[in-house]
Amino acid sequence: MSGNLRILAAVSATAALILLGPAVALADTDGITVHCVNMTSLDPRFSSCDDQHPTIQDAVNDAEAEESVLVGAGTYPEQVTVVRPLLLEGAGTASTTIKPGIVTSNTSSLFSGAPIAAIVLVNGTTGVAVTDLTVDGSAAASTFACSPGYVGIFYRASSGAIEDTHVTNVFHPLAPGCQTVLGIFVQSGNGGPGLNSNVAILNNVVDFYGKNGITANEPGTFVTVTSNMVTGRGATGLGDAAQNGVQIGFGARGLVSGNTISAHDYTPPDFVACGLLFFRAGGGLGRAKGNTFVANEQDICTAGVGPSSNSPFN
């Protein structure tokens, strides 16, 4: 089965349209299209494996464009960088976990150049699907403070889909007020050739994050945020972050629909925690529909002029 067909089989029709786009399928050069990691015969996908790898990054490095990396059950203590179109699929959020014990800066903000440590980095490519796994930042969270920024899944000038994943514990317990700690981040650096990002974020659980659950920033970024459960840390106060569940900001555009967004609250009222924050976004309230908001200080916030003291780094 070709890489395109595997991606179509793994993600929803909405996401597949984004993944495939106008690209022409690339020819396989080595006869290996399905790269497996720690896969055993107990996994129903085992018969489709063309090879086996000890780590996710090893399999990703070996995969050609539009091929598949299927990850077996287990906990993988690594950061992963993807730079070509492929499917990265786990055995389910309860079975496959990417949980590094330590993270280092592996990229930077396209806008400011600030260093970022991403657990899963999708950098400068299209057609990348991440599905059926957990990204857990807890083990590395106490090993550094507010710099570099800390991100669970970062689509940096990249397009594709994140579906049926759990992004959790991207949070600094010893420095909870850090503003650069995000569950999922999609960025385009003000757009331009090779910089646009178009990502479908579908049916995920994003929880226990530092600042924002899902963030999309800058012109050239479009996100479809649908059927996710985004849960903040509840009441936070002085020295902590005023959290936002979903942020569409700085010229980014997005459709936010059918999500459950809860537990964002900040005291004192100098700053506001928002379930959904549109900050100088390319689209307004018309781009949000059918969401369920529970226990947020403010369910939907909009800001259109000047800097906001309640927005993460850009």
How would you describe each model-predicted region?
Residues 1-11:
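Bacterial N-terminal signal peptides that target proteins for export
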Residues 64, 83-84, 93, 124-125, ...:
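Parallel beta-helix/beta-solenoid
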Residues 57, 61-65, 76-89, 97-132, ...:
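Extracellular beta-strand-rich solenoid/capping regions of secreted or surface-exposed proteins
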Residues 76-78, 88, 94-95, 127, ...:
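Extracellular beta-strand scaffolds
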